[in-house]
Amino acid sequence: MGIRHELDILLVSENLALKNVELLKGDSYGCTINIKVNQQKKLDFIIILRPDWTEVRNVKKINMVCNGVVIDTTLIKKSFYEEVYSSSVTVFQNTTVEFFSDTSKKYKEEYPIVNINTIKRYYEIKDSRMTCINFESPISDYDQVNYLKDYINISDDYYLYDACDDCIISSDDDDDNDNADDDEEDDDEVNDIEDDYE
């Protein structure tokens, strides 16, 4: 069946979880996130990797790049079942954040692309590519209890709160009925985000 790691990315500062970010098959994992902001903003990430040990002896380090600048990721928890990393970056403008284990074009072209508008609290899977990526907002109680308490750089304000009742989440359902699925308001939101990254 092939290697199947599991990768989740928690954008803690937006109370948003990107779940099942891993490739459907292969010893590689990553994601591109386009983030729209209108002011200085601190972005706090928790990256959770659950390795598939059936065919690998070691897992590849998760690298992070923000607008072309390498950002450190800190390993905060490690066990046989998972590796948990944390990272923070302060941005002043629209930003592209990339997470990846491989720099090979072959793999990076299979990583999903996500748009996050922090102003309108709108989240969109622009291209799921070779993944089954999906969103969870707010971050689940399970993830908060198991991961946020280990992230020592995050204040208690992020812990066990529910501030995202008005979030809009969009994803491509691949049912060939996209015109029927999208209403006019959603199209406007998506266009606002995509205009900033083209």
Curated annotation (Swiss-Prot):
Span-the-membrane segments of this chain are: none
- Region: Disordered; residue ranges are 171-198
GO biological process, any: viral process
Q: Which family does it belong to?
A: Belongs to the poxviridae C7 protein family.
Summarize the protein's role.
Answer: Plays a role for multiplication of the virus in different cell types.
Name recorded for this polypeptide: Probable host range protein 2
Please report the organism this UniProt entry assigns to the protein.
Lumpy skin disease virus (LSDV)
